[in-house]
Amino acid sequence: MNTGEYNKLGSAIEEVSRGQLGRWECYKQRLFFLVLALLVATVLWALILSTLLSSASSKLRVLLSHQDLLRTNASEQKMTLSSLKDDIGACRNCCSVTKAQLQTTLAEFKDIQAKLMEQESILKELQERVTQDLAKASRDRENIRSELFQALEAVKRQNSSCEQCPPSWLPFQGSCYYFSETQATWDTAQSYCGGQGAHLVIVRGLNEQGFLSQHTRGRGYWLGLRAVRHLNKIQGYRWVDGASLNFSHWNSGEPNDSRGHEDCIMMLHSGLWNDAPCTNERDGWICEKRSSCY
């Protein structure tokens, strides 16, 4: 091989070496950028992981704090529950005692109630006996009074100069009775009777009631009986002489105090009694006074 060929071969080798060196430089640059990119990515990931770990650590601390708080609350709730259980137990014991006391009280109440019912029955029986005795005494008194007046009238009839009652007045058992021909209110009728030395009739028994019923002549008449009110409620009835009502001859369903102002008593044409407003001017009246000689 001559010198020229060697020169050509050296030139060729030199050209090949230069090309390889250029490619190697290119590879080195690429590798540098790749390493740099990896390094940057690693740093970024490290920063991101650090941030995430810091956030997770903060959240973990918060969660642990909440856990401690929940444990504390759970402990307190457990203590409260235990206290409530104790209170419930005490209340149950108290309820048991109260229930026993109530049962005892109820038994005592039933016993007292039974005794009261027994006493009420005895009292009712006594009242019935007293009522019967009073009714019998009233009948006996009326019979004695009737017999006495009959005897007095018999004695008076023996004296021809004795006139028992004024004209237009009817005699009965020692009293004189005037049956009016006109109508008036109860107060007007009582005033008229007072002017005659009399009063509106007081019916003391069945005999007197029978006498009055025989002379009604199909008309109604005021009696000397009025209601006694207290707080706008009728408490009873009283005659014009102040005596309480012992004998009565009421019509069916009477007295009913219709509309709350039927305070005066009148006798129907049938002889039965009825309550009516004292301002009623549709009825006559009957005056009564003791008989005397003129």
Swiss-Prot record:
Location (main, coarse): membrane
Matches recorded under SMART domains: CLECT
Membrane side Extracellular: residue ranges: 52-294
Recorded GO MF terms: carbohydrate derivative binding; D-mannose binding; fructose binding; polysaccharide binding; virus coreceptor activity; virus receptor activity
Glycosylation sites per record: N73, N159, N246, N256
Keyword terms, alphabetized: Cell membrane, Coiled coil, Disulfide bond, Glycoprotein, Lectin, Membrane, Signal-anchor, Transmembrane, Transmembrane helix
Coiled-coil portions: 100-151
Compartments reported by the entry: Cell membrane
Membrane topology designation: Single-pass type II membrane protein
Cystine residue pairs: C264-C278
C-type lectin domain: residues covered: 172-287
Intervals, Cytoplasmic compartment: 1-30
Membrane-crossing residue ranges in chain numbering: 31-51
Listed SUPFAM superfamilies: C-type lectin-like
Protein's GO biological process: alpha-beta T cell proliferation; immature T cell proliferation in thymus; negative regulation of alpha-beta T cell proliferation; negative regulation of immature T cell proliferation in thymus; negative regulation of T cell mediated immunity; negative regulation of T cell proliferation; positive regulation of viral life cycle; T cell mediated immunity
GO CC field: plasma membrane
PANTHER family referenced in this protein's UniProt entry, alphabetically: MANNOSE, PHOSPHOLIPASE, LECTIN RECEPTOR RELATED (PTHR22803)
Task of the protein: Binds mannose, N-acetylglucosamine (GlcNAc) and fucose, but not galactose, in a Ca(2+)-dependent manner.
Name of protein: C-type lectin domain family 4 member G
Taxonomic lineage of the native organism: Eukaryota, Metazoa, Chordata, Craniata, Vertebrata
